[in-house]
Amino acid sequence: MATKLEAFINDLRLQCETNDTTKYVSIVLFCEKETTLKLFFQYIDGIDTNSEPKLAVLSPTLSPVGYYTKEITTEDGWQVILNITCIPPPWKSSSIDLLPSILKSDPEKSSKRFVLLLDWINEDQSYWLEDIEGLFVQLKQVSPETKAAGSVMMLHSDYCKHLENTHTKWSSTAIDFMHQSLRTLALHLKISLYSDLKNSVLAAKSAVGVPLSTEEQKSLIDMVNLENVNVTYGSDSLNKIAMIDENFPLSVYKDNLSTLKHDFSDVIPEIKPRNMGSCAITEPIKPLPDLQSLIPDVQGQLSHLYELQRKNSSLKRVTNQPAVVQDIGQDNTMALNDIASDNNHLQHVPDDDSALDSLVHGIVQRHQIS
């Protein structure tokens, strides 16, 4: 993952190249549930309340891939174009295999962000350490050349206080252990860690790479309580993590994540065993189609319209001569019924040549055919 200094230098270089304050960010969001994604979109909308479209009013899509674009204007005058790709995490599907194709289609000058959304209410926290490490290790394997800043953001983070107050297994000791474990892992993976209780919009803004002012950066950072934790990469240290609980064996865990993950699974209550067989998609994900194959067969559409118009004209000539219709045999009646059936199914076909020409012209203009 890119360091904070590398990300800053890259942003500065891009700004000098474009000679303006426009910033392009390509974000890949990983989350389990569309309700989680919808809540995160509310926070993104809050960065610039005047910007359109409102992501929160759209139907969020995760399977296999959802794609959204949003333009944001910050108070400092930055124009930020967010290209957001949403896919399920690796423990839910194999959509991550599409990542190289997704990143290849992003604007060349855009900075990259990988963001994992976790939900305190809708997910099993006992798997979080394993999931976080697994995702960011796999990202390096799938796309080793990509320099991207990584983040984890916990949504509904105030729910951890509810668990601490109402569940015997969620003691204050367990909460502190989880707090220190998450920050130790984030420090090891060189990623940022956010929550949404205190500064949801600022946390989302930082996670997706929208520039923060100096005052916003000071307001965002919080290292005291798990429900409020917001730690950007480069601002944390082992000494700061040790201040939460001095009994946390940092000297053991900092170089031994296997032991940390094992102890984490023992301390953090498991809600329900994960059935990997039922949640993982075993079918291979088809590669993204060639864009040329997505272009409509306009010539075929035009030929079909002319054929329908010919049938429509024949039908009008026949229906305007009732005496002739009465003399038509049963075979011709069946043929007439076929023509009428075609006409009924496409009543929007114009009745006159000028209207048809107008429709054809509209199709040609829409697809820019010369």
Swiss-Prot record:
This is Cytoplasmic dynein intermediate light chain DYN3. It comes from Kluyveromyces lactis (strain ATCC 8585 / CBS 2359 / DSM 70799 / NBRC 1267 / NRRL Y-1140 / WM37). Belongs to the dynein light intermediate chain DYN3 family. GO terms for cellular component: cytoplasm; dynein complex; microtubule. The cytoplasmic dynein is composed of at least two heavy chains and a number of intermediate and light chains. It comes from the Eukaryota. It is found in: Cytoplasm, Cytoskeleton. Keywords: Cytoplasm, Cytoskeleton, Dynein, Microtubule, Motor protein. Component of the cytoplasmic dynein which acts as a motor for the intracellular retrograde motility of vesicles and organelles along microtubules. May play an important role in the proper orientation of the mitotic spindle into the budding daughter cell yeast. Probably required for normal progression of the cell cycle. The keyword Cell membrane does not apply. The keyword Iron-sulfur does not apply.
